[in-house]
Amino acid sequence: NKLLILSFALMQMTLFAQENKKVQKLDTILIKSTRIDLPFKENSRTINVVTSAAIKNSAATNVADLLQQVAGVDIRRRGTAGSQSDLYIRGGGFDQTLLLIDGIKMDDAQTGHHTMNAALPLEVIERIEIIKGPAARVFGQNAFTGAINIVTKKKLSNKVSINLEAGSFGQLNYSATVGKEYENTSIIAHAGSLNSDGYRTNSDYENNNYFLKGIFNKKNQPIEVLATFFDKKIGAENFYTTNPAWNEYEETQNSLLGVSTTFRTEKFKISPRIYWRRGQDIFLLKRDDPSFFRNLHITNKVGVEANVSYTSEMGITGFGIDISRFFISSDNLGNRNRTMANLFLEHRFTLWDNVDVTPGVAVTYFSDFKFNAFPGLDVGVQLTDNF
């Protein structure tokens, strides 16, 4: 009986200790993948967020490997170390899925096959927002089956990190990431290189990446400047053909330069942005004989956009305009250009404190296809505080 009483007393002490554990509240994530910024728990769209903690705890070494772990996202890869990959959401093709970096559209004038060439190194990513399902109403074309927004870090608090890896088949990876905080400025810089001789014939690669982000005038009107450059040289054995006599080879470049800021008042939020994106792709069917078959494509996109949200007693209204000019120079497609304009409008109504309705429309103009409209409606019901 004494043993039974002692065991019961220990069980009571254990239960008492569990009841006194502190509850840790997590920071609210404000979703930026929509025209209207909303806390994650209040958003009615099907959105997954890969947080910085999830990125840190993941075994993934690049964005392609990380996204492959998300249900509903299909990454089809060729080669290793993120050398080449195509992005699919819910069965849509790579031309139907849009990639954004800090809200900047990274669509390519030639093909969505180059979308993932713009993926950033994990060291500078704060989180990744994944919209599953039709998003053309929010982002226009190239987002018919979904969109992925990579949100970069704003500061690294005077940190320096260096990475060096070596392995079989001539593998050598190295990178450096630096964060510097000044009184009125934040700077993040990253440079890295992934190299290998390849585990089989013509599977070598050299992938170089550079990233620079600055936030200036932080105390008054913050201005963000973002610059990236990626250069890949890939032995593309059997990437596009199965003929063992052809040693395919590909070189790609992807660069981005963007400047943005945000103006805020009690009811208005205005976010203008200007950006330039460049892509280059060289493909050789025979690596040792460039004259046999060679494709060269150079694409440029220059754009300006502004997003506005207005909060009133009727709810939140989101309005956006995006005007861009595409250029392509190709020894196969020739020299072409196109002007595109997107106009977005949506309004979020809240009914009975637990029902939200968001109708909206996107109107897209192409200089060679004229106008197209993409209407849509989101409806959400909050059953409990957490569901």
Regions found by a protein language model. Give the residues of each.
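N-terminal periplasmic "start-of-domain" segments of outer-membrane beta-barrel proteins
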Residues: 28-56, 86
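Short acidic/polar hinge/loop motifs at secondary-structure boundaries
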Residues: 86, 104-132, 150-153
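Extracytoplasmic beta-strand/coil segments of soluble accessory domains associated
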Residues: 64, 68-104, 108, 126
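Repeated loop/turn-to-beta-strand initiation elements of outer-membrane beta-barrel proteins
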Residues: 158, 184-188, 220-225, 233, ...
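Short strand-turn segments of transmembrane beta-barrel domains in outer membranes
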Residues: 147, 152-180, 190-192, 196-203
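Flexible loop and strand-edge segments within Gram-negative outer membrane beta-barrel domains
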Residues: 196-207, 211, 220-301
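Structural signature of Gram-negative outer-membrane beta-barrels, strongest in the C-terminal barrel
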Residues: 227, 261, 314, 332-387
